[in-house]
Amino acid sequence: MGAPGQVTLQVYVKHGCETCDRARKIAQLVDAEFPEVSVEIVDMNESQPQREDVFAVPTYVLEDHILSLGNPQESELREEIKALLRVRGLV
């Protein structure tokens, strides 16, 4: 997980998943825009998910809570992250 004081976003993907390519790009955008967010790409081809509730890809998990099955609207993802950062006092 992320360093203390950081928020963690995990994005579960698989090779050959067309929408997962977009998920990787969204993850890169979040990583560039929010230095307070630790972004982790979890490739389900390489390892089994540690979560039983991740059964589809892409899946976005923000601070241990499933935020989206499938790619969210970028604006909605930004708002969710900003809201969590405000609650945590990181912005």
Where in this protein do the model-derived segments appear?
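Local sequence-structure signature of Cys/Sec-based thiol-disulfide redox active-site neighborhoods
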Residues: 1-33
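Residues at alpha-helix caps and immediate loop-helix transition turns in enzyme cores, especially N-
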Residues: 22-23, 53, 73
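Thiol-based oxidoreductase modules, predominantly thioredoxin-like and allied folds used
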Residues: 35-48
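Structural micro-motif
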Residues: 52-61
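Non-catalytic, surface beta->alpha helical segment in thiol-disulfide oxidoreductase systems
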Residues: 62-91
